[in-house]
């Protein structure tokens, strides 16, 4: 009987743990390259990527996502001032001369919608050389308020 109590106590103590892990705690592995929104200029629809938690949306990840999606149009994050993200497109030839009006508009929409999904950013300033279909500008998220969100 004494051995049974000792074994029972040992089992109880062995099963007690002081882990700080919460039951049902979900861990997210977030890529360094994301786009929070999938945009479609033709239908004026933006679809939120539900696999990305709000806490995972950072300017660095969004910029990396844009550069991965549009390798011909490299965008740099320069700084944040107030609610504006300042960016640069060092070589805007492809954007301004080869993508056409619709392509450039789609790129700007994708960039603005995704960059302004970062908390605290409402405007994006683009610095680039002037081209036929693209030039330096500042665009706010409000430009896309009439788009349907899904």
Q: What does each model-identified segment do?
A:
Residues 1-2, 79:
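A generic structural motif
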Residues 2-3, 138:
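Short glycine/proline-enriched turn or capping motifs at secondary-structure junctions
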Residues 3-13:
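Sec-dependent N-terminal signal peptides
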Residues 16-150:
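Bimodal "functional hotspot" detector
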């Amino acid at each position: 009987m004494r051995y049974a109590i000792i074994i029972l106590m040992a089992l109880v103590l062995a099963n007690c743990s002081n882990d700080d892990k919460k039951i049902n705690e979900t861990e997210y592995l977030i890529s360094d390259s994301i786009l929070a929104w999938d945009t479609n200029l033709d239908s004026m629809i933006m679809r939120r990527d539900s696999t990305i938690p709000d806490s995972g949306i950072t300017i660095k990840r969004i910029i990396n996502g844009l550069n991965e999606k549009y390798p011909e149009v490299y965008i740099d994050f320069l700084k944040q001032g107030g609610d504006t993200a300042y960016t640069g497109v060092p070589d805007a030839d492809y954007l301004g001369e080869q993508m056409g009006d619709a392509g450039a508009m789609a790129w700007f929409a994708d960039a603005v919608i995704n960059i302004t999904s970062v908390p605290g950013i409402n405007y994006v300033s683009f610095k680039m050389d002037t081209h036929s279909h693209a030039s330096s500008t500042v665009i706010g998220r409000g430009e896309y308020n009439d788009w349907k969100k899904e």
